[in-house]
Amino acid sequence: MDIRNNDPGAVQYGNFFNYYQFSSAAERVKLLPDADIWLPALEDGETQKDKPYFILDVGCNCGVLTQLMHKYLEERLHRSVKVLGVDIDPRLIQRASEENESPKDVSYACVDVLDDEAFESVKTYMEVNNLEKFDAICCYSITMWIHLNHHDQGLRFFLQKLSNLAELLVVEPQPWKCYQKAERRLKKAGEIFPLFLELKWRSDVDLQIQKYLEESLDRRKIFKSAPTKWQRKICFYR
């Protein structure tokens, strides 16, 4: 984990070690919708309760929200829920694995989603579980870090890559003021995000993400949560 100038908030990839001390996972879970949003519409008489519900949680950090989301959905979907949590930071993944309360249903892997070689572990998980797509892929508060490090086209590629593997795509974009704060903290530590000034998606980045998902990836927004204390909204696209 690259912490600059002894400031735990000055990180390049959003891999905060104490993230859930200032961003309550329990409060986030309260904003999640009920079962009807998570499940696809079924034909009369069709049921999938005997099948596990598979989730990929991208940017899972140390797994606190992953664990709470797993419990939340098992209680509401009334079926087995399987979650693969991935994060770029091996120390966060180690911590998540050590504190895993449901090792039969929840697993973790150190994966950079934009690294094709690293992403093979996700594809292997899909093959082992006979998945063409995940029932849901969740991206909680990570789009900014993809954007800052991989430019507009990198963020679009990230969204497209995950959209292709998801029945339901859950995105919680950070607003532009979060970018400005991240840039200030890194600059104060003596470094910068080299691509920051080149970004075209800026003050309306959350709307640009929605527009791209709807117009380019043919997604439809079916739910938007109330704002978190950081004024972020969790959006569900099918």
Curated annotation (Swiss-Prot):
Q: Kindly give the InterPro entries that the UniProt entry links to this protein.
A: Bin3-like (IPR039772), Bin3_C (IPR010675), BIN3_SAM-bd_dom (IPR024160), SAM-dependent_MTases_sf (IPR029063)
Record SUPFAM superfamilies: S-adenosyl-L-methionine-dependent methyltransferases (SSF53335)
Gene3D superfamilies reported in the protein's UniProt record: Vaccinia Virus protein VP39 (3.40.50.150)
What's in the GO CC field? Answer: cytoplasm
| Molecular function per GO | O-methyltransferase activity; RNA methyltransferase activity
Enzyme Commission no: 2.1.1.-
Gene Ontology BP terms: methylation; negative regulation of pre-miRNA processing
| Cysteine disulfide links | none
What are the residue boundaries of the Bin3-type SAM domain, all occurrences included?
1-238
Record key words, sorted: Methyltransferase, S-adenosyl-L-methionine, Transferase
What is the uppermost EC class here? transferase
Biological role stated in the UniProt entry: Probable RNA methyltransferase.
Similarity annotation: Belongs to the methyltransferase superfamily.
Name of the protein described by the UniProt record: Probable RNA methyltransferase CG11342
